[in-house]
Amino acid sequence: MMPRRDVLFLSLLLVIATVSAVALADDEADCVYTFFLRTGSTFKAGTDSIISARVYDKYGDYIGIRNLEAWGGLMGPGYNYYERGNLDIFSGKAPCLPSPVCSLNLTSDGSGDHHGWYVNYVEVTTAGVHAKCSYQSFDVEQWLASDTSPYELSAVRNNCPVSLRESVGRVGSEIRKTLSWIV
């Protein structure tokens, strides 16, 4: 009878260990990312397009947000985002990056009646439990438009201490496998 009890006890321990490991894996540390976007005051600087963002750390790991407004628009119901002279604020949770945000890819989908958008700057803050808070400012000063110079719907700003090209080749990044686009 004793060996059967040992097998039952070991089986119970195995089940408890498995459940605990799964529970801990699902409890991945999240950070709160807040984006401050300033639209230029130039005539027709505002847009009705959907704006997405990717922020990278120095290793090339990233989080991506397909639609900033849907993900975490904080300006209230009925507010018209990305209008001339506005400072728009977006905030939401996503997995913490291994190091502070240092690069930005800001993209317009070019949709809507007024697709051109002039961006002054973007500021990104990050805060999380047991994670170091960080702040990064990106001077954009560029049109995101297909009919105005530089004729691009994306703006990339890299303030990283090392080249992202060198870092993207880093092997073994679990974050790159689990993150990609959030919304």
Swiss-Prot record:
Compartments (UniProt record): Endoplasmic reticulum
Q: State the GO CC annotations.
A: endoplasmic reticulum; secretory vesicle; thylakoid; vacuole
Keyword set includes Repeat: no
The annotated consequence of gene deletion is: No visible phenotype under normal growth conditions.
Q: Which residues form a coiled coil?
A: none
Endoplasmic reticulum keyword on record: yes
Domain PLAT residue range list:
31-158
The alphabetized UniProt keywords are: Endoplasmic reticulum, Signal, Stress response
What InterPro entries would the database entry show? Answer: PLAT/LH2_dom (IPR001024), PLAT/LH2_dom_sf (IPR036392)
Residues annotated as signal peptide = 1-25
Upregulation details from the record are: Down-regulated by salt stress.
| First-listed, main subcellular location of the protein, grouped into a coarse class | endoplasmic reticulum
The protein's role, per its UniProt record: Involved in response to abiotic stress.
- The entry's protein name is PLAT domain-containing protein 2
Provide the species name. Answer: Arabidopsis thaliana
